[in-house]
Amino acid sequence: MAFAEISSRSKNLLHLCVIGPECTGKSTLSVMLANHYSTNWVPEYARAYLDKLNRPYEQTDLLKIAHGQIRLEEEWMRDARRLVVFDTNLLVLKIWSEHKYGTCDPEIIRHHESRRYDHYFLTDIDIPWEDDPQREHPKLREHFGKVYNELVRSSGIPYTLLSGTPHQRLEKAITIVDDLLNQRSATNH
C-alpha cells in the first residue's frame, strides 16, 4: 500500500506526539493541548479498529492499524492550524508487536521512521490505572515506562517527560509548545 507524502502545508506545522504506556493520560493531554491551540489532534486509530474487531487482535492486525493510523494522520493534518497533536504514533505498534510477538513487521518500522515529529511528550505512569477492555498490562506499566523512555530518548527527537495531574502536565506542555512556536516564528521572519 502506498501513502502520499505529507503535503507541503503540513510540513509547516509543528508536529507534537504524546506517547507513553497504557493509561497514562495520553488522550486527555492530546485533546487538552489541541483545544488550547484551537487545532486538530489525531486520535489513536488502534482504539477504533479494536472496538470493531470481534475477536482478539493478531499480529497481522497491527499492519492494518498502522495503515489506518497513517491515513488518519494525513486526514487530520490537512485542516490543522500551526500545530498538530498526535495521540501516539506507530512506535506504540512496534513496542506492542515486539512485546507480544517477539518481532515487528518491517513495514511498520519503515513507516514509523519516515514520519516527522518535532517533539515528544512522554507521559509518566504516575496517573492511577483505569480498567478498559483494550488495556492489557496493568502490572507492566513500570516496564513499559522504561521501554518508552529508552526509545524516545534514543530517537534523537526532543522530548519532555510529563508527570503530575492532567492540569500540571498541560501547563508544562503549553510552556514547551509556546517556546517551540516562538522559535519557529523567529526563524521564519
Task: List where the protein language model places each region.
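Conserved substrate/cofactor phosphate-moiety recognition/catalytic segment
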Residues: 31-74
